[in-house]
Amino acid sequence: QDAARRDFTCNALYYNPARGEITDFHHGVADIRAKRLVMIGDARARYQEDPVRMLRAARLSGKLGFQVAPDTAAPIAECLHLLPKEPLARLFDEVMKLLFSGAAIDCLKQMQALGMDGQSVHPLLACALERLPENQGRGIVALALNSTDSRLRADQGVSVGFVLAAVLWPQVREAWQRAQSSGLRTMPALSAAVAETRAHMEKGWGVPHRFTASMREIWQLQPQFEHRRGARPFRLLAQPRFRARPRRRAAHPPPGSVVP
């Protein structure tokens, strides 16, 4: 019964340490060997039962390098409308698992391959998907996610606030430019753009305040990058907000860091 409640066949394997045996109720071993992600049961019914499984399909297949089985992928398009009805906190948690999976770029590309446009899932993913191709894949979003993937694969700590600030910086920058065009000076315009973006994040996106606070600090430091002489650039590089926390094995990770 427990095996039948699992979502994918690769997650329904049971190991008996006393006998050194794996019990496989749903042909999961064969699917793993074939690098194939297969839903247990009727995929449409399982997505309707728990829409977050669609995000899990993109994340697991992207991270593991699996192909999603046709019967598992086919119902996603008609079930996508169910995802926004899920609690914001749960969706945000799944978004974090995807962005900090160690294979964020591959997971996002898999979302696209499965027909999952970011806006139907979560605004953070919509921003990431929209900006990913910028500068031939070397824009700020792609660079930040690639750097995060590399650090996670190297078992190093990462800063959630820094990564999310990078993903949303193009949006903040555009709002900043609009505010300046309306007549506001540099810093008041930036503060207005940051406040506008934070309001969206905290009310409609489910992003916790502890992350938006560090993101605000990072955004408000951006004008200082224009000062490139003397000691100021070196002081800026030493800013704690631009430094990832060291990896720590702890029951409760420090706020602002992710330990996969």
Functional labels for PLM-detected ranges:
Residues 1-260:
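Catalytic cores of the polymerase beta-like nucleotidyltransferase superfamily
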